[in-house]
């Protein structure tokens, strides 16, 4: 029997509460997701039969080896705009062999306002005939299209969408680039940003952020600090973050293209980086009292954990409670949890997004 939304949420609450009980956190703050139409992106295989074309996903059988093809005619967890476009796009592909020949995947990326980018992926070279057909399709459906094949990328319109998220009455614009990481659940993302700003409660000193991505948290958090230094290694994310800072007219943020490990080396004076000099970033000019981290699923490495322990406040957003738990074993030696939250980014899956504010004991 399948669980209701509230049942699956309650099981996550119980699991997280039990897992972190040894750290004696305050009461868990819970932020729910819409039950349907919450995903702003979706990826499907395009399945070909003798006389049909349809969206497909794969489901492994019980032994985990054989994959079963599941036909997908609608996708209730995806945003309404994706569900509305899916059949229209499929009919256009079926009607035009130039667009359907050797296509094997279609990826959708949308925004709360309905702006749409569709990536069509092929097992063949994309020629001028394809480009002409794709331009006509983009115009007809009022979407942006990206064509991809091995070693080839053809952009019809733009390779990004612009999301607008509201935090405490202010709207922030975010460039979200195709194939770069973005938060998939925009409604819950707004709740995460609002919570992060609420728990910080302002500072007359500076914020250090590691793993900043496209500046998702950086922009709203910057309003609560004198200056912000944010680090990110991926070039496309750094580019998007710089665009977002400029578009939102925020002037107290600098972006350093460094990994967390590299920043630790630079901060401790162990290594100099030309990238910092070229960006005119003087780390020693900052007076940090707070560090914000939103690391990948693997969590934070030991050297970076040592860096975190030197900060008065640590705001940690985690997409993996197991690595957060392991990191807290170290951080709880010097800090205590003063805020604790669960964000249901991924309803009906085992994945849990959580947040903790840690303050120096």
Swiss-Prot record:
Catalytic activity line of the entry: uridine(54) in tRNA + S-adenosyl-L-methionine = 5-methyluridine(54) in tRNA + S-adenosyl-L-homocysteine + H(+); uridine(341) in tmRNA + S-adenosyl-L-methionine = 5-methyluridine(341) in tmRNA + S-adenosyl-L-homocysteine + H(+)
Keyword field: Methyltransferase, S-adenosyl-L-methionine, Transferase, tRNA processing
GO annotations of cellular component type: cytosol
Domain of life: Bacteria
GO BP term, example: tRNA methylation
Active site: 319 (nucleophile), 353 (proton acceptor)
Protein residues bound to S-adenosyl-L-methionine: 183, 211, 216, 232, 294
InterPro entries xrefs: MeTrfase_TrmA_AS, SAM-dependent_MTases_sf, TrmA_MeTrfase, U5_MeTrfase_fam
Keyword S-adenosyl-L-methionine in annotation: yes
Listed EC numbers: 2.1.1.-, 2.1.1.35
MF (Gene Ontology): rRNA binding; tRNA (uracil(54)-C5)-methyltransferase activity, S-adenosyl methionine-dependent; tRNA binding
Family that this chain belongs to: Belongs to the class I-like SAM-binding methyltransferase superfamily. RNA M5U methyltransferase family. TrmA subfamily.
Protein purpose: Dual-specificity methyltransferase that catalyzes the formation of 5-methyluridine at position 54 (m5U54) in all tRNAs, and that of position 341 (m5U341) in tmRNA (transfer-mRNA).
Annotated PANTHER family: TRNA/TMRNA (URACIL-C(5))-METHYLTRANSFERASE, TRNA_TMRNA (URACIL-C(5))-METHYLTRANSFERASE
Record-given protein name: tRNA/tmRNA (uracil-C(5))-methyltransferase
Annotated organism of origin: Acinetobacter baylyi (strain ATCC 33305 / BD413 / ADP1)
